[in-house]
Each structure stands twice: as C-alpha cells, then as structure tokens.
Amino acid sequence: MDLIQQQIAHEEALVGAAQNDARIALEKAIAQGSIDRIPRARIMLMRMLPIVTEAIFAHQEAKAAGPAAKLRHLLRIIDAQDLAVMALRAGLSMLINYPTITATKYYTHMGKMLCREIEVRLAFKVNQPYYDRTLDYLKTSRTRSVRHIQKTMDALLDAVLPEEARIDLPDGDYLRLGKFIGDPLIQCGLFEPNRFTGRGGTSVHLEPSPEAREFLQDPSAAMTWGGPGRSVMLAPPRPWNDWCDGGYYSAKAQKHHVLVRRTKHQTKRARQAQLRHLGQDKMPKVYEAVNVLQSVAYEINRDVYEIIERVFNSGGGVLGIPQRTYPDKPEFPLGDEWAKENASEQELEAFNRWKRSVHRWYTGEREHTAKLREFAALYRVVREHHGKAVYFPMHVDSRGRMYYWGTPNPQGSDIAKACLRFHDKRVLGKRGLYWLKVHVANSLGCDKVYFDDRAAWVDERWDDFQRALAEGPENYPGLFPEAESPLCAIAGLLELRAAYASGNPEGYRSGFIVHMDATCSGLQHYSAILRDEIGGAYVNLLPPGLAKADIYSRVLGLVNESLERDRAPGAEGEARGYALLWDKAGLSRSLTKKPCMTLVYGTTFKGVVDHCLDYLDESGVEIPEGVPSYRLGSYMATLILDAIRETVPSAVFAMEWLQRLAKALPDASKDLHWITPLGMQVFQSYPKTEEVRVRLRAEAVEYVTLYEAKDELDPMRNANGIAPNFVHGLDSSHLGLTALACAAEDIPIQAIHDSMGTYASDVDRMHVHIREQFIAMYSGPCVLVELAKQLGVEATPPRRGSLNLEAVRDSWAFFC
C-alpha cells in the first residue's frame, strides 16, 4: 500500500472513530445496556435515570404560568421515563463530542430533539406500515450513522405527515421547550453551568461535571476521540487547487476541512460573496503559501515524549504537564443563605473576588482538559506512527490567518511544540549549535539580552542542565520555570546533548526547529505603516543596542510615574487612595504585558479592568471595605491605556482612523471587502442579532441569552472589528510572504502567526527574509490609503513620521 492509500485508509478510520466509536458506542451502550463496552456510562445512566425521570414528570404536572407554559402540552405527549432516557442519551453524546457547549445550543438541541420524537411517533400512528418498512430498511442496511438515520426519518416525515402536522417553532421556543428536559441533566450532576463575559456580552456554557470529567479522562474514552483533525497525515497533503479541493484525500474529510473557514462574524451574504473570490486565480499567493507550509514533513521526538509520559504517569503537575486530576473549584465563601440584594459592601467584594477566582478556575480547567486531549492524541500518534514522516494540512480563516489541522499541532501547547521536529535532517554547523543555545535561553525566559549573551547563559549552566537531564528535569523546577516553555527548553537541551555526544557536534544532523518571535507584532505593523520612530523604537523596528527594547517595561514605567504623581502627599481625591493601594501590590511588567499585546487585536476597556483585578487578586492584596473594586481596576486600566497611547501613538491613531473609515462608508449596509498584501480576499460583515432572554432557574443564573444572527449588517460592530481584522491580515501576509521567500532557498518554515521557525542551521537566512519581506510590505503605497480606495471611501491620508524602514534590516531584536 502506497502512502496515499495509507492516508485514505487512515482518514476513513479516523472519521469512523469520530462518528462511531465516540458517539454510537456511547449511545448503543445506553440503548442496549452494553456495560462491557463503556461501564462508566452504564453506571452514570442507571444512577441518574430515576432523578431525571422524576424531574421531567414534575415539569409535566406543573401548572405554572410564563412564556414556556404554552409549550407544556408538547412535553406531556411523551412518557417521562422515555423523555429521561432520550435526554440522557443526548447529554452523554454531547459529553463525547463537545468539551463545552453553550446553554443556548444545548437547550435548543434538546427542544428540537423532543419535537422530532413527537413527529416520528405521530407518523407511526398515521401510517404504521410505512414506518415499519423504514425501520426494516435501516436494520437491513446495518447503518450506524446517526446522520443517515436522521435523513431516513426526514424522508419518512415528508412522506407521511401533512405540512400542518409538522412542528415548526421559533428558536426561542425550542430553547424553552428544551429546558424542560435539559435542566434535569444539570440537577442530576451531568453538566455544570459556567457564565462567561466577553466582548460579545455574557453567555452561559455547560461543561462536564467532575464525575463526567473523570469519565472523559478514562483512556478507553479519550482514545476514541478522532476525526482527521485530531491526528496527523501520513502522506503529504493534497495541494490546494480550490477552496474546497485540497488537504485531505477522502471525500468525507475534505467536506469538513475546507481551505477557508466561515466565521460566525459573517453574514451569509458576505460568506457567499467571499466564496466567489476564493479561487486560486484571485489569490494565488495565498494558495502558494499554504501549499508550501503544509508540505513540510515532521516527526515525533520520542525522547521528549518519554519524559512527558513519565511525568504524567507519576501524577503530572510540573513542567507544564497536566495533572491527572484538576483541583476542586473554589468554594463559595458566603454560605448557602447569602443573598446578593441584602449584602454588605464587604460581602459584595468577597463575592466579586470569588467570581474572578472561579473564572480563572474555569479557564484553567478548560486548558487542563485541552492538554489531556492533546496528550491522548500524542500517545496515539507515538504508538501508531513513531519514526514516520507526518504532515499537517493548512487552512485559513476569513481574515487570512493561517492554521494547521492535526494533533499534536505545531501551533499547540508547549507539549506539542516540544514533541515535533522536522523529519528530514540537516547538518547543524557552528551557527546551528549557536541557535540551539539561543532557543534554550528563549524558552527559559532569558530573551531580553543579545543573542551572544543568551548562548553564553546556556553555556554557563550547562553542567546543571546535564545533571537535570540525567536525574529528571521534573526534579529541577528552579531550572525549568513553568511560566516559560520548559518542555521546548528540554527538547533543545536533549538535542544539544546528542550533538555533543556524537563527537562532531557541528556535523550532527538535526531536525530541531528553532523559533523567532515578533515583539508585539500588531504594534510593529502600525508603527511601520505610519513610520513612527517613537513607537518603532519600543517594538524594535530600530536597532536597540545590546538589550532589546521592552515596551511592557516602558509602559510600566509610565504607569509608575502616574502612580507617584497621584500618591504624592499633596495629591487629593480618590486617585490618591487608589494609587496607594496599587503601590501595595508591587507592580511588574506582567501587569502591562497583556494589554500591550492585545490592544490591536480588539481588547476592551472592561477586559483590561478584569486583567488588573486578577493581578490584584493574585498579588494577595485585600481591597478595603468601601473601595469599589471595579473603580479601582478602572483607575489602573486607564493609566495603562494612556501609557500605551503615549508609547505607541501611531498604533492608537491607526486604529481610530480605521474605525472612522468604516463609519464613513457611503452605504452602511455594504460589506467591507479588502485584499491583504498576500492577496487574501477579506469580507467582513458583522451581522445584527436578535436577542431572546430565557431564565435559567436550575443554574441560579438570571438569564441565558439566545442570539439569532440576521442577514443584515451591524455598522457599529463592523467599525469596531475592522482594526483587529486588518492587523490579523497583515500578520498572516508577513508570514506567508516570508514562507515563500524561504521556500525559494529550500528553507522550510513552521508558522505560528507572529512566530516563525526553521532548522537551527537556517535561522540566519530566515532572519534575513523576515526583515526583507516586512520592509517590502511597507515600502510601497501606504496600506491604509490603499484600504480606503478598496472600500471606496475618500479619506485624508494619515500623517507619517520619519522612520527609515531600512533600519529594520539591522535590528537583531525585530524577531528574536
């Protein structure tokens, strides 16, 4: 069997695993009682069934009024125990397919499922012979495809039921109906609700309860998760010839893995318009770049994997390797009888602090679950494909941002990156050894000084590193801080040790990948566009000397100056009190790093406030009674954002200019369409949404909000979205152009958005191309002016400074 035949068989097996082993095995175990196949599911079902049945029966018998009362007659059509089994089967299926699911999607699915069951039962009464023939067909075909069964039943309903007998409800009513059978699954402990607040507002997500998480961590369950995107390719991906023709080989895999994904921030109209512009003839360089990037062969670094496996099997929790179990959620500090409306200010502060800690816990728990899934996939790949060349097909989002499919993913966690290296090997040479050392230093946080100093830093600690490798890196937490990338550092040290052990380190053949990262790439783009010498210096567009410019420290310095002014003895007002409180926290650059990094990608003022309050909590600072936490956070957020504005004024100006440009469109209902420097056809059209609010009594949440997207543009969201989407397109363009330039010299690139990696021996040439392509992108007409022309808006060109772009060529810290 050749590689392509192996890959097709591999894809078909993975698709089968995803559709059958994960979903049908669980549903069949519930329906048939196959306890030998999934014993934990059997235990959960048998324990929960009486509780769910009783709760649904209570809903059926209730007389309460309200928006959902008109739907209760539908609930009463089916026996409570039948509904309970149906709901539990669906709920357990969701556990397999989704690590988290929005409450709106969950309830709406339950409501539609209930209505479908009612319709099929009615069809049975209307025409039992037709139903029996349909059932015989399904049995004869021995289908295990849920989708196939659904399509067959659709045909039955179309043939048997008249249109007036079909159930057709608004989404809001499906949601309300679904609550009747969905809430009992939360009450019995299958799911837990979690409330998230983001830029789009507040939403409720349902996640597996601790018992369900334990079920998911069972290796027999984890190893059944599949689909081509959950593994690797064994043959080079098919070159993309069209947006739906490339990547995977089998028809099923191709259908669900197209080149350009639709985003939820697009109207249907915008998506259809974009599809008409996604041909290879309209954006040839995009196709060329993704084909180059996905043609690179990788392999698993078995030595690194064995360290990860050993640490995980001993309990995990060090070197960034997940614990086998996740810590319990923070306990509610105020007692069961506490009521928010009767709370004191001190109690409200304790409540808000607890909410922030729970939010951090859920974030950590999701990351923990993701790492467990990543480790399970890594285990499978090592077991089945160790020593083989493996590949990762590429795709892009609607802005042109490039991603790999597959697990372990080159853009994944420290675990994934450390375990991947190029399959083909190249001689290290003197410079390759040098860059390996720089990589180790970068991975351990020694990344502010010049490259020579980083390499020397590793040499000075070589004996300590050798001892740690011999005795187990997990026993040396001081050498490998988890805040950095300890596993990538260990991978580099293992490669160095192997090179030295060969007796000819410069002649050692290596597939190790060394990455170079941008310094706040979004700010680099805007500073270059407007030729901003001030901002450009702080993001290393200009040569910085022997230590790279640190914008986070610069912003922190300005914040400290403001604090010193506000806390001076003669200062008055609440600002002085806030400044004194923040002084107690002991400010560090971690406070300003995240806002600097996320400003150009659409962070909100509230997001910065929440970040500041999290920093206070983690610093152990108690907010005194009577001090409103949000105002305290707002005070610091304002100082940080003002400091960023002073440090990189061009970036803030460019973002505001872009927003004004979007608002100046002559037709506010028109999609925004522009072309990135790489040639990506971007169609931005944020849809208006209609909001339906439903109370969730079982979760103790006041409302869950259902958003129904309309095929109508929201001008305000469109204006707010243009700046982050525009800079994402610039990031991906720089990456794609650099990958093409490197490919011309046979230098493969591993792409991580604003970070690029290659062979240690080729890092010097990669540095050259990174800089040359950046200079070339901005040496022509101003991209902001070109954007205005593409949008058909007459706009005053923004003022530009005197930054000489050629200086980027000599800035060692531009990517470092």
From Swiss-Prot:
The gene is gp26. This is DNA-directed RNA polymerase. It is an enzyme of class 2 (transferase). The active site is at 517, 593, 754. It comes from the Viruses. It comes from Pseudomonas phage phiKMV. It catalyses: RNA(n) + a ribonucleoside 5'-triphosphate = RNA(n+1) + diphosphate. One of its GO terms (molecular function) is DNA binding. GO terms for biological process: DNA-templated transcription; DNA-templated viral transcription. SMART domains: RPOL_N (SM01311). One of its GO terms (cellular component) is DNA-directed RNA polymerase complex. DNA-dependent RNA polymerase that catalyzes the transcription of viral genes. Keywords: DNA-directed RNA polymerase, Nucleotidyltransferase, Transcription, Transferase, Viral transcription. The keyword Transmembrane helix does not apply. SUPFAM superfamilies: DNA/RNA polymerases (SSF56672). Signal peptide: none annotated.
